[in-house]
Amino acid sequence: MTNNPKWWDNTVTIYNKYSDPITNVVRWYRTVVSGCFWKRTTEKISLNNSVLESDNVICRIPENENFRQKYDWLQIPNDQMQNYFTLGIGDIIVNGEVTDEINEYTAGARSSDVLKKYADLGTMTIESVRINTKTGVLFNRHYLAKGV
């Protein structure tokens, strides 16, 4: 049982990108996680009498026994990677449970297609990750992904 706040009520689909170092074939592994927090924000910056806007997404994922840090996940044999997930720069998160498989070699199934297809649900390409599993009373143990 988790002690996450009641507003951590989102289910997300995480797509982990893996490039085989021998064959250079790109594969994506999909994982669905529930009990997450999802928030889209717009950041405004004033610069030289102009206002620049940037959309950002924050996703908090509760601590999970199947999570591996990126380096450790990359050491897992290919036939077992689907049993675990990671969060790394360039990985994709969709706000909601989706079943699409990403295949960069098939038109309509590429990562760009999935991002476009689910834009209304909410998607992010991860730009930074923080592992908050040693936090104190103020926050629950979780992984924080930020992106656009």
Q: What is the predicted function of each stretch?
A:
Residues 1-34, 41-44:
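N-terminal intrinsically disordered, low-complexity, charge/repeat-rich segments that act as generic
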